[in-house]
């Protein structure tokens, strides 16, 4: 009876080389497919949050929900100290996931969006604190400060929008952004420097999250959501921390010709 010959060394090396080539070709495609899937989930989250933010206002005589993260969990709600869309966790720096979830459940928007997954981008895996510690956040999104939030320094510091009717062309104004606060949870509200503030009109402001590398999702005041692919490498560098310290807001060099910054400024809702 004849014996079957096994693979020669050269044949085995050829097979290994072919497998290596296939892996090198397929891995980027698999990574891209996974990223597209998480981007779509995140976009769906912002669609849910934005549409329910809108419904909250419609159910409350046009008054929009508070865009701050206030007060701290356990603080009684009063007329002068109303609850906002989410509250503040009991631990300020690096709160546990259960603490963050409780802060979400105590917020005003929870009765409209009782799905904890809707508050979390699947690409939001970890955050690096200013001391290098790894923190884990749950709430991946923030409301802009001018929408009944904590305001924003400069020209629109005390010009908060409290009624839905004050938002002109809501389909052009965003409400929710992706943010990655260095404290492990998104404290307060988010803001960008508007063009009406001459001394700061070429500066970004608060950083956005870099969950999707060169893209970010936005939730808009008419209830829709969209993806923005950043056009400038400098924008991606800023979002990834090249020009901003984790403890400093707006610590970045001016950028006089940046279409991404103009996009953020044009979509930022405020009263001039």
Model-found features: residue ranges?
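Generic N-terminal leader/processing signal
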Residues: 1-3, 29, 45, 193
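N-terminal single-pass transmembrane signal-anchor helix
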Residues: 3-34
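Juxtamembrane interface helices immediately C-terminal to a transmembrane segment
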Residues: 25, 34-45
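Short, well-structured segments within or immediately adjacent to enzyme catalytic domains
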Residues: 40-272
């Amino acid at each position: 009876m004849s014996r079957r010959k096994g693979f020669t060394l050269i044949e085995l090396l050829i097979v290994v080389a072919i497998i290596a080539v296939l892996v090198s070709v397929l891995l980027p495609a698999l990574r891209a497919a996974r990223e597209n899937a998480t981007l779509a989930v995140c976009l769906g989250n912002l669609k849910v949050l934005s549409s329910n933010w809108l419904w909250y206002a419609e159910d409350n005589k046009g008054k929009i929900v508070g865009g701050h993260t206030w007060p701290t969990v356990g603080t009684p709600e009063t007329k002068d100290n109303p609850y906002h869309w989410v509250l503040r966790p009991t631990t300020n720096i690096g709160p546990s996931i259960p603490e963050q979830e409780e802060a979400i459940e105590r917020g005003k928007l929870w009765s409209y969006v009782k799905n904890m997954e809707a508050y979390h981008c699947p690409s939001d895996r970890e955050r690096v604190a200013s001391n290098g510690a790894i923190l884990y956040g749950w709430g991946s999104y923030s409301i802009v400060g001018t929408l009944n939030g904590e305001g924003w320094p400069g020209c629109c510091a005390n010009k908060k929008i409290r009624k839905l009717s004050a938002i002109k062309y809501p389909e052009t104004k965003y409400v929710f952004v992706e943010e990655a606060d260095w404290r492990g949870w998104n404290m307060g509200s988010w803001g960008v420097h508007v063009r009406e503030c001459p001394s700061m009109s070429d500066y970004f402001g608060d950083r956005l999250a870099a969950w999707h590398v060169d893209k970010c999702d936005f939730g808009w005041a008419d209830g829709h959501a969209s993806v923005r692919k950043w056009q400038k490498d400098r924008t991606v560098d800023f979002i990834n921390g090249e020009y901003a310290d984790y403890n400093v807001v707006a610590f970045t060099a001016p950028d006089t010709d940046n279409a991404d910054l103009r996009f953020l400024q044009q979509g930022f809702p405020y009263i001039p």
